[in-house]
């Protein structure tokens, strides 16, 4: 990698409207099967079986760690030459593995993760799963989270879209509940207190059912659920749930809302296949995004939000020490995990200048509310609107960074060291995927990640240790 000064690569920021461009760059990202890393921890009674080659196994070992003593709830079904040449019976091999999994771990659900190889050899995982499920009496969910996706975070999207088909239907569940309640009321009709309690329980929620989708740590889901509870909004359930048996009921009349910008496939499945109504809201990343997310849900249910402005102001006041560090600094997003729009919007609100937002894939319909909030934020902060580049070409991005000289580049791991060697501070975008960045209180964690290289540079400058890099960065 080297720098070559070309003025044609520099594009100025726009002032009036968002500018969308599409380049033909390659996708430099993790494989989507890495979603196993956080999903197997979220769904506590699950087991993930990745059907792939040695390369997939090496990747999982490096990405997740060997974990010899932890006995993790995931494994590799390694394809061999006999599988690829159709000399072995795929069904019998998978049956043997799943039977062993049932004997050793007895999970409530087994998730088959398809890979590039299963796509190439046309392995019929969807056809084998129902037969094997009936035979071993354990639900089997098939998700093709292969490397043909745009970003590694879309692996979660694929798994959640597959699980959305397994959610119970709200109408059948409601009918069963009504039958049980009627029978209980007739049985206990001589107890007025019980009858009163039953009526109160029916009148608890005055709005339609609300299901939130997106895999977040349990403490974060509790925080977001509590924030909505303060507005008299009850969350019927989360997709995914901590246990497979606790999947939320969906169907006609159920409202769904996402918490991550890379879940467009799940949103489409819930709308088209399960007939749910999608609430198109900004994502709850940063105090501004969390407030807008809650306000949008409140507006759909006809509820007047209470105390959100004071809550957001309180959080911003607690972040002043970080805001003083980032205010006036510039940042360049190379694009990696589809969180770029939300993070850029939050950093602009913090006072940073965003030159460019590179993103591997852009679903403008699913992220429409987030894009509108980004535009509104830029207008309120009186800053130019950043360029949004879909499928960015990394060579062209390097040239633009050479011209713009940002204070920070948020990039994939592959480009971090070369950019650091040329004097551009970097932050791995994958760290934002695994950090707790949702909700009001976790905004500090975002700024902790963003300011770490800035604070490091400040310390090095005070020690006088940055002269060598600064002197040689343009000649490298």
UniProtKB/Swiss-Prot annotation:
Family annotation (SUPFAM superfamilies): Helical backbone' metal receptor (SSF53807)
GO BP term, example: light-independent chlorophyll biosynthetic process
Pfam families: Oxidored_nitro
Cofactor note: Binds 1 [4Fe-4S] cluster per heterodimer. The cluster is bound at the heterodimer interface by residues from both subunits.
TM annotation in the entry: none
Pathway: Porphyrin-containing compound metabolism; chlorophyll biosynthesis (light-independent)
Enzyme Commission no: 1.3.7.7
Classification via InterPro entries: LIPOR_BchN/ChlN, Nase/OxRdtase_comp1, Protochl_reductN
UniProt-annotated binding residues for [4Fe-4S] cluster: 31, 56, 116
GO cellular component: a single term: chloroplast
This protein's record includes keyword Mitochondrion: no
Main localization of the protein described in the UniProt heading: plastid
UniProtKB keywords: 4Fe-4S, ATP-binding, Chlorophyll biosynthesis, Chloroplast, Iron, Iron-sulfur, Metal-binding, Nucleotide-binding, Oxidoreductase, Photosynthesis, Plastid
Annotated compartments: Plastid, Chloroplast
GO molecular function, one term: metal ion binding
Catalytic activity: chlorophyllide a + oxidized 2[4Fe-4S]-[ferredoxin] + 2 ADP + 2 phosphate = protochlorophyllide a + reduced 2[4Fe-4S]-[ferredoxin] + 2 ATP + 2 H2O
Family assignment from sequence similarity: Belongs to the BchN/ChlN family.
Subunit annotation: Protochlorophyllide reductase is composed of three subunits; ChlL, ChlN and ChlB. Forms a heterotetramer of two ChlB and two ChlN subunits.
Function according to Swiss-Prot or TrEMBL: Component of the dark-operative protochlorophyllide reductase (DPOR) that uses Mg-ATP and reduced ferredoxin to reduce ring D of protochlorophyllide (Pchlide) to form chlorophyllide a (Chlide). This reaction is light-independent. The NB-protein (ChlN-ChlB) is the catalytic component of the complex.
Name used for this protein in its record: Light-independent protochlorophyllide reductase subunit N
The organism of origin for this protein: Staurastrum punctulatum
